[in-house]
């Protein structure tokens, strides 16, 4: 990122609050399409001389502003295959370059804020999504109430553009942004159809994820700011803080804010035992205090979405549940708080007695049914969990077939080894093991029993169960009691950066 910043002379444009010229740099599109910085996507694909690449980008932007999006002239269309595509193709190309520009800008701002908050030193240790579960184990068992929140969408994109303008003072850049969004969405409607959002995210994945993450970041920045300053905001209207122009100016003078008659008012409160966790669009809010405080946070979220982002959200979509009676899904796991009975023997003088103790314990369980459905979708088994062969892999060598199945088992073990109960994980391994045997038998045109008999033993397939034990034995002492204890306990791997079920069972 520092190399790109130096190469694109980003500091000079940031000082002038003018990023629009960066869209005309051909190196931006080299980054967007994973090309080398010294080569141009336009030069490589079309055969243009290097000096014309800037002209092509300018032509594309000019054509986006015109009513006739198809062909500038017959002369141009005959010479340039590149100019015969439709307007969505032009928007897609330039939006990728636009996304690179804003990604670099906001990543630099994020790094600066982390350094100021002295978080940058521990940031690398918190990159793994599995670091959330040790946090749950330490905190959740002491809490009483939990709320499972879905961040509403789609957002009014015009509101999102207006919010972005308070971060970057560049009017031409946002005129271009509006033009991208206008190509995919009905700009005049308050609620953007989900079909348009799906089309936009499919054609412009980098740009879409930037806008979606910025929406979440803006929502959480207001939430965290008001959460930390809640003791100073008692009996104040929170509608006044939604005007972003005055929002940051009043951060140092919150006591001086006047009580005004706005559309909605919320009494702020102090809740030191509240915890908030989010991954993608799903959030978990947990608290130790009375449910009335959780109810206040619930209506705070609803008013925030409706008044600031113009996103409709109903109170019944957010449920407040008692943690001891509620279970929830998060990051592919099934979590619930259970009671563990423990008996302690005590003795006073000559009298002995037993003390029964109830201890809260967080159970993190592998959801066996969704994983079996995922395996059934990939044709490893049927919907009942009965293993099937993979005829499409029969043309591969035996070594490649076994390697693919082992890779899938390794991914599943790597991700779900933090489960409290390993029986479900072993069942999934068993399904994959039999699916591998059936695939090999199908390749050699024999039955499973005849194939195993001809093989003589199952040493070739023992890796399905011994590989994990060999890895653990390299880390911990080679004692049977230690390995048995490790198989019962949870093991979290802090090198998992994202969660995607399709990638877990992907053989590539």
UniProtKB/Swiss-Prot annotation:
This protein's UniProt keywords: Chloroplast, mRNA processing, Plastid, RNA-binding, tRNA processing
Gene Ontology molecular-function annotations: RNA binding
GO biological process, one term: mRNA processing
Cysteine pairs bridged by disulfides in the record: none
Pfam families according to UniProt: Intron_maturas2, MatK_N
GO cellular component, one term: chloroplast
Localization: Plastid, Chloroplast
Function noted in UniProt: Usually encoded in the trnK tRNA gene intron. Probably assists in splicing its own and other chloroplast group II introns.
Similarity section: Belongs to the intron maturase 2 family. MatK subfamily.
PANTHER family reported for this sequence: MATURASE K (PTHR34811:SF1)
Record's protein name: Maturase K
